[in-house]
């Protein structure tokens, strides 16, 4: 069989192209019951998102979704798992890739593309294991 294409990598220089930074972020949601005040009514449900307080600039001390830069030897999924473990102390969470955010000037440091994963968890089973800089916020 004849080859249609040949690749000659000696002429390829990766430094000829600008490269963006890529992050993997995780949107963790939970639905939980409120306090039942009337036995004749169903408990109120609360929809929450997990945020972490940033400890670095830019946006130091602001709340954000957990995320981090993808290492050269990591996949997006591996990075998401690492980020959840290091920033929230959560492990073995099933995630699905949700969306890729690629606005050009969304990060003041450099060009950043973010691959966002999503998960739905039972926060009542996780609250005791969370790190102090991670907190649930009700979505209204």
Residue ranges and their predicted role:
Residues 1-4, 12, 60-63, 126-140:
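Nudix hydrolase/Nudix homology domain
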Residues 2-8, 62, 80-85, 101:
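Generic detector of short, locally flexible boundary/turn motifs and exposed helical patches
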Residues 6-7, 11-64, 92:
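N-terminal strand-loop-strand
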Residues 44, 77-81, 85-140:
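Active-site segment of metal-dependent pyrophosphate-handling enzymes
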Residues 54, 67, 139:
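Active-site donor-binding loop signature of nucleotide-sugar glycosyltransferases
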Residues 57, 71-72, 105:
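Glycine-/small-residue-rich active-site loops that bind phosphorylated ligands and cofactors
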Residues 64-73:
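Short histidine-centered catalytic/ligand-binding loop motif
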